[in-house]
Amino acid sequence: WRHMRFIFLIIFLISNIYANTNKDFTLYKKDGTTSGHTLLIIGGIHGDEPGGYFAPAFLEKYYTIKKGSVWIAPSVNIDSMIANQRGIYGDMNRKFSTISKDDKDLKNIEKIKSLILDKKVDLILNLHDGHGFYRQNYENAIFNPRAWGQATIIDQDKIHSLEKFGNLDEIASTVRDNLNKDKLFQDHHYFGVKNTETKAKDEQQQLSLTFFAVTNNKPAFAIETSKNITDLTEKVIYQLKSIEEFMRIMDIEFSRNFDINNYKEVQKLLF
């Protein structure tokens, strides 16, 4: 029997290595004692962006939701996270418009779509690390309008048919202003709002998670911390502070048993 168990283990490991689908991901639902709005957080869609998956895992572990609900999927692209690659089956964030039936990400894409379209979900955040530091005007190769880091990303100004949270630019601007008023680790870490104007200007972004959400009348934003910030603790703190701003806008009440402005304390919990 011990030999059989060993053989089963080997078969299991080999089948995992040569799996024809990406691993399933876990959804955590944190519900307050008082009902309210529901925030859906997607992390780890790109496997080489640790700020985008450590932050939601940290949120799941160390936050309590008192009013409203927060649904967290911290690791939707596990195979790529393990490989520390953007997407070992191709870019997962470019599969929300069309996807072939034999794509290894198909099951996970369908699962994410069904979560986005869930009637309970009021707003979606997709967490990333992006290169450089977004600036409205070109400064140099790192600080420029084509960079993604330290920005809240929107696909358009507004979802016109939507009263609740449809004012994407206004919401993102509030988040930006509050983040920049708070403590930044370096002055050049300040946040911006990047509007990709997806429908008119960006064919690649038309394949993305947030654009899928927006075209289905679901407010969605990407939070991008900079890949040029090499300190993971700093990135996680920026991600968490961004998420907290969205929770405040959504009237989601929460508590945490640590000081978010205490770098050492967050670092200790993280590692």
Task: Briefly describe each language-model feature range.
Residues W1-H3:
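Short, Lys/Arg-enriched N-terminal segments with co-localized hydrophobic residues
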Residues F6-S15:
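Sec-dependent N-terminal signal peptides
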Residues N20-F271:
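Structured catalytic-domain cores with a bias toward divalent-metal coordination
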